[in-house]
Design a protein with these regions (language model features):
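Flexible, compositionally biased loop and terminal segments
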Residues: 1-251
Length: 251
């Protein structure tokens, strides 16, 4: 069975209007450590279950008709965590990249990694390159994994790239637009998320998609990430669909 093909219990969609789904849902997957602590388990156990939750939610998003799912897997600040926890997260990433390489084409799911990938191991970088190569031949649902990612870091990285282009004569400051600047971001080519979800009861972005979230709707829930399921996602989508999105105007 493939990385994203594991079946979950599907329920009636209830009030979800499939004609008004967000194209792009982004999730801050928070609460793995607390989930483990509540059960007397090491934090690493929470990350293992949380990785499985990601696979289930990605499959459900694809089946529902969402086009893009972006998750915050590892931030630029997460290197400060205990070494064994960081090692476990990196080992999980390696495991799921290997599984993805074997199943992406069969499951028709593209996988893209966003962030400063120069800081990860050469082995993981090679696996990222391989998943990118496979994804280039797939059309359809795309799962984006933010790895060694920080919103401010992304904007600085984009600004430096633009500055280099200006110095080389390939760009001019007076010609820069929001759309043009977006092309320098890690997320270039991906539409901004309409809905951003954070689990575990925390109500902050923690540097997630700071440029892209200008008009996103935010949804915060108390559910810890390992317990987040298709019903919880439906509730978030229903809340999103109940809102009046004006984009700075009036109706």
């Amino acid at each position: 069975m493939g990385l994203f093909s594991k079946k979950i219990h599907h329920h009636e969609a209830g009030q979800v209007d499939k004609s008004r789904l967000p194209r792009h849902i982004a999730i801050i997957m928070d609460g793995n450590g607390r989930w483990a602590k509540q059960r007397g388990l090491p934090r690493t156990a929470g990350h293992k279950v949380g990785a499985e939750t990601f696979r289930k939610i990605a499959t459900y998003c694809k089946d529902l008709g969402v086009e893009y799912l972006t998750v915050y897997a590892f931030s630029t600040e997460n290197w400060k965590r205990p070494a064994d926890e960081v090692s476990t997260i990196m080992a999980l990433l390696k495991q799921y990249m290997l599984e993805a390489i074997d199943s992406m084409e069969r499951d028709q799911i593209r996988l893209r990694f966003l962030g400063d990938l120069s800081a990860i191991s050469p082995e993981l970088q090679a696996l990222v390159d391989r998943t990118n190569e496979i994804s280039s031949h797939i059309h359809g649902f795309q799962a984006n994994v933010c790895l060694n990612y920080g919103g401010r870091d992304e904007i600085l990285h984009a600004a430096r790239r633009f500055a280099r282009d200006c110095a080389d004569g390939a760009a001019a400051p007076e010609d820069l637009t929001e759309e043009g600047f977006s092309s320098y971001l890690y997320s270039a080519g991906i539409p901004d998320p309409e809905l951003i979800i954070r689990t575990s009861g925390e109500e902050r972005l923690s540097g997630f998609l700071l440029w892209q979230c200008a008009y996103s709707e935010f949804y915060f829930c108390d559910t810890l990430w390992p317990d987040f399921d298709s019903r919880a996602l439906d509730q978030a989508i229903i809340a999103y669909q109940s809102r009046d999105r004006r984009f700075g105007g009036v109706k």
